[in-house]
């Protein structure tokens, strides 16, 4: 529902674990999204193929648990959905950084964090101050 509500060209979806990634991928494929999983259960060739298909636009959703957290430059992505609120500030920053890079074809990015408690919301909002100091405009919207 969130993918439909917030129209974006390409999404990276971060999940809690591989099982959740597989289930989420199955659900969104049934809804007509072109998506694939990126994790360490796949062999190198399949991971590379999924990544290249995402970067070229053949896939519009790439689902991963931690394999894309660090070391990947994904300027093609203009949306991120974080389905697992990590207690690691570093991990959250890395995940958000996957889509915050501005390119010639992208003026902004959308990050949706699904959280379960008000405590998580307050913590995430406080962390956003770091990005505002770096001149990254942030707009918070609480969805029900």
Feature roles, as predicted:
Residues 53-56, 80-81, 99-100, 129-130:
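Short, hinge-like loop/turn segments at secondary-structure boundaries
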Residues 1-12:
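Conserved interdomain linker/interface between the two RecA-like ATPase lobes of SF2 helicase motors
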Residues 61-65, 69-86, 91-92, 108-114:
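A short beta-strand element within the Helicase C-terminal
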Residues 88-96, 101-144:
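A conserved SF2-helicase RecA2
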Residues 10-14, 19-69:
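Conserved helicase ATPase core of P-loop NTP-dependent helicases/translocases
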Residues 16, 40, 85, 114-116:
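Cofactor-binding loop segments of dinucleotide-utilizing enzymes, especially the Rossmann-like FAD-
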Residues 25-26, 73-77, 93-94, 125-126:
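Short amphipathic alpha-helical segments
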């Amino acid at each position: 529902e969130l993918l439909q509500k917030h129209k974006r060209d390409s999404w990276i979806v971060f999940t809690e674990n591989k099982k959740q990634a597989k289930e989420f991928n199955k659900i969104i494929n049934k809804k007509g999204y072109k998506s694939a999983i990126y994790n360490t259960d796949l062999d190198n060739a399949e991971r590379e193929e999924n990544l290249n298909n995402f970067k070229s636009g053949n896939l519009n959703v790439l689902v991963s648990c931690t394999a894309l957290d660090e070391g990947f430059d994904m300027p093609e992505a203009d949306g991120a959905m974080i389905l697992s609120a990590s207690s690691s500030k570093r991990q959250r920053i890395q995940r958000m950084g996957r889509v915050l890079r501005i390119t010639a074809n992208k003026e902004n990015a959308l990050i949706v964090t699904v959280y379960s408690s008000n405590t998580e919301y307050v913590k995430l909002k406080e962390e956003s101050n770091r990005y505002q100091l770096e001149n990254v405009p942030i707009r918070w919207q609480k969805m029900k």
